[in-house]
C-alpha cells in the first residue's frame, strides 16, 4: 500500500490546506524575497519567536537510524537504469522533498521574529569538494526542488549542479562573494555583516544575495559517512534562516535477534537532526520525519509523483 495514502493523523489547526496545483499568491507587504509571511498562525506561534529570539536557543535535537536493505536495492535499480553515482544522499534528499509535499509546515523558517513559508520552493544546501583530496577546496551548492519532484528529478538537479561547480565553475558565486569580503578589514567586516543581518531581519536582503548565501534555505544536509565517521549534531546558524540541519553517517552492521531466536546481521545508517522548534508544532515535525522513515523503508514510492500535494496556510 502506498505510504502516502496512509494519513491517519488528524491535521492540527495551523497545519496545512489541501490544494493541487499550488494556489497563486500575490506578494503582500511583509513578505520576503524567499518566502511569504504566515498571518493565520495561532498566538503562541507568533509569540514564541520573541521568547526564544535566537535559532541556537530554540533548537531541538534528535537522532534515529534506518535499515538500508531496501535503500540498497533501490540504489542498484537506479544505477542499472543509467543513473550513475545514484546513492544514499539522493534517496535522503528525495525523501525530504516528499516530506514537504505532505507536511509543508516543515518548510517554514523564522526571520525577524516572524514565521514565513518557502511555499513550494524547497531549498537544500550541500557542501561538496571539487576533488576527493585533502587539499581540494570545498564549496556550497544550493539546490531548488518542488514538492512534486521524484527521485529521478532530484538526481538530475543534483548531478547538474555538482558537475557545473566541479568542472565549469572554478569559483561559485558564494566563493567569489566570500573572497570579496575577505579583503575587508576586520572591524569594517564586522559592521558589514551587522548591516546584512539588519537587512535580513527586515526582509530587505536582496534576492541575489539570498540565492548565494549558504545560510538561507529549507535544510542543510551533510554526509559524515563519506568521511567514515558517525553523524554529528550540527548547530543552526543565527544568521540566515535555515531551520533544519541533517547529518548522516556511514553504514554499519548490527546483529539482531529474530522472533525464532536466530541471529541476523543487518546494515544501518544513523542520522542526527537539529531543528528550529519555532517553525511549527512538534506534531508536524514528528509526523514529517516518521513519513521520511516510511519512504526509506519503501523508497520505490519516490519514483512516482505524490498523489496529493498539501500547501501551507496563509
Q: What residue ranges belong to the model's regions?
A:
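C-terminal catalytic/motor cores of large multi-domain enzyme assemblies
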Residues: 2-314
Amino acid at each position: 500500500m502506498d505510504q502516502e495514502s496512509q494519513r491517519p493523523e488528524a491535521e492540527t489547526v495551523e497545519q496545512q490546506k489541501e490544494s493541487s496545483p499550488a494556489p497563486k499568491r500575490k506578494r503582500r507587504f511583509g513578505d520576503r524575497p524567499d518566502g511569504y509571511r504566515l498571518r493565520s498562525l495561532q498566538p503562541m506561534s507568533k509569540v514564541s519567536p520573541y521568547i526564544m529570539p535566537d535559532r541556537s536557543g530554540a533548537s531541538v535535537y534528535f537522532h534515529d537510524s534506518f535499515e538500508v536493505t531496501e535503500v540498497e536495492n533501490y540504489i542498484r535499480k537506479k544505477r542499472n537504469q543509467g543513473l550513475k553515482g545514484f546513492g544514499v544522499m539522493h534517496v535522503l534528499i528525495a525523501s525530504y522533498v516528499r516530506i514537504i509535499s505532505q507536511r509543508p509546515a516543515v518548510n517554514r523558517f523564522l526571520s525577524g521574529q516572524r514565521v514565513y513559508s518557502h511555499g513550494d520552493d524547497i531549498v537544500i544546501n550541500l557542501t561538496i569538494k571539487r576533488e576527493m583530496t585533502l587539499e581540494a577546496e570545498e564549496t556550497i551548492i544550493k539546490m531548488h526542488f518542488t514538492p512534486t519532484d521524484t527521485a529521478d528529478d532530484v538526481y538530475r538537479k543534483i548531478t547538474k549542479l555538482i558537475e557545473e561547480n566541479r568542472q565549469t565553475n572554478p569559483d561559485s558565486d558564494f566563493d567569489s562573494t566570500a573572497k570579496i569580503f575577505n579583503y575587508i578589514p576586520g572591524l569594517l567586516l564586522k559592521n558589514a555583516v551587522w548591516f546584512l543581518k539588519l537587512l535580513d531581519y527586515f526582509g530587505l536582503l536582496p534576492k541575489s544575495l539570498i540565492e548565494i548565501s549558504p545560510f538561507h534555505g529549507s535544510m542543510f544536509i551533510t554526509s559524515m559517512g563519506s568521511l567514515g565517521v558517525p553523524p554529528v549534531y550540527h548547530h543552526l546558524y543565527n544568521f540566515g534562516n535555515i531551520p533544519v540541519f541533517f547529518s548522516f553517517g556511514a553504514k554499519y552492521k548490527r546483529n539482531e535477534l529474530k522472533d525464532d531466536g536466530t541471529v541476523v546481521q543487518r546494515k544501518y545508517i544513523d542520522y542526527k537532526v537539529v531543528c528550529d522548534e519555532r517553525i511549527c508544532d512538534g506534531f508536524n515535525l514528528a509526523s514529517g520525519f516518521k513519513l521520511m522513515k516510511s519512504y526509506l523503508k519503501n523508497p520505490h514510492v519516490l519514483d512516482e509523483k505524490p498523489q496529493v500535494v498539501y500547501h501551507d496556510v496563509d
